[in-house]
Every structure is written in C-alpha cells, then in structure tokens.
Amino acid sequence: MTQANLSETLFKPRFKHPETSTLVRRFNHGAQPPVQSALDGKTIPHWYRMINRLMWIWRGIDPREILDVQARIVMSDAERTDDDLYDTVIGYRGGNWIYEWATQAMVWQQKACAEEDPQLSGRHWLHAATLYNIAAYPHLKGDDLAEQAQALSNRAYEEAAQRLPGTMRQMEFTVPGGAPITGFLHMPKGDGPFPTVLMCGGLDAMQTDYYSLYERYFAPRGIAMLTIDMPSVGFSSKWKLTQDSSLLHQHVLKALPNVPWVDHTRVAAFGFRFGANVAVRLAYLESPRLKAVACLGPVVHTLLSDFKCQQQVPEMYLDVLASRLGMHDASDEALRVELNRYSLKVQGLLGRRCPTPMLSGYWKNDPFSPEEDSRLITSSTADGKLLEIPFNPVYRNFDKGLQEITDWIEKRLC
C-alpha cells in the first residue's frame, strides 16, 4: 500500500470523531495564569494546546511553517467545541488541529517520495514524521484521529531511518503480564557493541521525537540511543501508567545483555520531564545495570504533590496527566490524590542514598520543575551534578545544556 493510500484509508471519515479538548472531563479551574517553559512551550490566549515552538524548531520544523499552520487553524470558521479556542474545530476538516498538521506532513511525504537523493528523501520523511507527531499532540488516550496520525508518523520515521546515516533497528521487547512493546535502537557508524543511552521521554511526546538528540549529541560521540514509548501512548499504548512508572524501561534494561549491538555494561538513562521520574526510579532499582542517569526539567516530586504548583499548570498538561493515569472522568481532587503517589519522595526513594551517578538540569522559575526537585536528585547521590540552564537566549542555552549533559554522560560511559 502506498503512503498516500495509507493516509486516505486511515483518515477516511467513519463517524464523528471526538474533539481532543473534550476527551478528559475534569472540573475546570477557570482562568489560568500564563505559563512559559523551555521544554513545554507557552500558553497563548485562545489556544487549548501549549504551543511548543522551541521543541518543534529543535526537531527541525521551520518557524514560518508553524505560523502558517496556526494561521490556517485561526482562519477557519468551522464549528468548534469552544468558540473561544481556535484549536477545537470538530471533525477532520479544514481548521482542525490534526487535519492541518497532517496535511502539512503529507506535503513533505510527497516531497520525500519524489526525491531521488536518498539522504534528502530521508530528511523529508523525518520532517513528515515530526509534523504527524505534532498533529497527534498532546497524544490523549481515545483520540482516534491522533492515533491515526501517530501511525503515519511511525511509518514515515521507519522510511526516514532507511535513508539517514547510521543504522536503526526496530526491536520488540517482551513484558510479562501484557503485550510486548516496540522500541527503536539508533546506532552510529562503526562496529558495535555501542555504549547506549536509554531515552525516557516526556508524557506529551513520542519516542520518534528524539532523533535530533541522537543525531546532534550522541551519534558524533559513538553513542547509541534506544527509545521506547511511555506507558499508554504509541507502541506502549496497551500499558497504563502506574506508580511503578519505570516498569517497561526496567524490562528493556534487563533484556539488553541479549542485544548484540548494545554494550550492556555501558548504559545510561536520560529522562525529560516525567521521563526523569522513570530514569531516577531506574537509578535506585536497577543501579547495577546503569552507569549514570541524567535528567532535564524533572517531574519527580513538587508538581505531583504540591496543590499550588498544580494550580499553575495549564489545563492541557493536567489533561495529559489524567489521560496517562486512565482518569478521564476524575475530579481534580481525585487526580491530586493519585498524582501524589507518583512522587518519588512519597514513594520513599528520593532522599535515600543512591549509588548511581545522577545529573539534573533545570531552569529557574520553571512551573513544572522547580530547582528543589533537581537538588533533591543530585543530593541523593555521592556523584551528583546540578546544572542550571539560563532561559534566554532559549535555543542557544538549550543546545549548550544538552552538550554539557552529553559530555557528562560520555565520561561515565566511555
């Protein structure tokens, strides 16, 4: 089946698809303060979704392309769930968030098919995969159209990997008590086995969102990167996120001695946002299997246990948390009680001495991850490094922070 035909088949109208902002039915807090964060973007009036320009540009999307798609959404006069929110157009049609970003992805998909140069074609496929992922953002459970966009993203990513430098292998991992999960092992040029970083991504991202991290930071140093989706999304969608947040990643770690391309004696974990919750749990529970753990903007305690902090967080992000926990109809009070159980301090881990070296990077006044969370992580180990990343200029400092983190990981792996 051609890519174009796959797109037509997946998005063929069958019934009135639920609109993304309606999928989680919590009691609304009302007006929220504006939020700006390096890793999550910022709240913009009249948008349900946080607009995450930094990360989208970092993944290779042109800022003008972002504005063009936003303009098409704004200009639509189609019916919306909430007339005050541009990105709540109902149905797969012009103005709908998923429709507009997927349409943009199809433009690049067609360019990829027409391009004869393999590397350039691979770049176009990767661009299409990223746009399909933005279409599916924030990846709420039960969002049928978003899940179809994710399927197209994975397909485009596989096409890209066949053409881009290095080697990528799609791997299946068995997890007792449930469905197997699929991960992607990205390997640099040269002979393996390679030192490897196990990526633990954020809750509002897919494993295919981190190719830039591999290409710009790990591959030049001869380090491989292994990704899996977080519980409840993508290839891990059959698994619900539980208080044992590191369950899937633990089973992957245990399987690495049987993966010939990975040097299982030289493995580190790297956690973005809630992925740091997973990575730090691994530091405690699987320390013999890990040389180091690095975190960026970690969500390990405060956001999960502090009501005032939760009140500062945008509705969309709380919807993401509720969706991952399978609490689509829960009250805010029930959600708060459940989130508290995910705090690694409440679980009795953070604060105890940890044998694994840990680094944590943070931004001052980050509404999702205060400095205290990073200090809690780095003070729990004898080999801890606290890294403050200045906010402005945001892109340059983000890149500099990732270079420093990669330096730190490399010293412990190589």
From Swiss-Prot:
SUPFAM superfamilies: alpha/beta-Hydrolases. InterPro entries: AB_hydrolase_fold, FrsA, FrsA-like, FrsA_esterase. It comes from the Bacteria. Its EC number is 3.1.1.1. Keywords: Hydrolase, Serine esterase. Pfam families: FrsA-like. Signal peptide: none annotated. It is an enzyme of class 3 (hydrolase). The keyword Hydrolase applies. It catalyses: a carboxylic ester + H2O = an alcohol + a carboxylate + H(+). One of its GO terms (molecular function) is carboxylesterase activity. Belongs to the FrsA family. Catalyzes the hydrolysis of esters. This is Esterase FrsA. The gene is frsA.
